[in-house]
Amino acid sequence: MDLREMSTPALAYLGDCVLELCVREYLVESGLSTSRNLNREALNFVRASAQAEAMKKLFPILTEEEEAFFRRGRNIGHTNVPKNATVSDYRTATGMEVLFGYLHVSGQKERINELFRAAYLQDAE
């Protein structure tokens, strides 16, 4: 399937899962072991505000094609924005999810790992 023809909400749906898996793998590898601690810490990564902040770190290193997929996601017309997120953060987070969905579907696992590290782990290392 041509990625340009794949629905943007479908890419966001997949990207949400990809990001969640990256976060879960990182947290388990970091030594957290109870589901309560894992779930609480995961929220620090997957909240719309956290994803919007993470995207600021990614913009300088995105390719043109990656930027295009991000914009595609950011520009989805949202009708339901969670009450704990701003419209801007939610749109940016959706763009990030579409970006990671695109990378997953196109088989770019190393790029997913690279961007995840740059977005969330750069300051921690």
Please identify what each model-predicted range represents.
Residues 1-125:
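Double-stranded RNA-binding/processing signature
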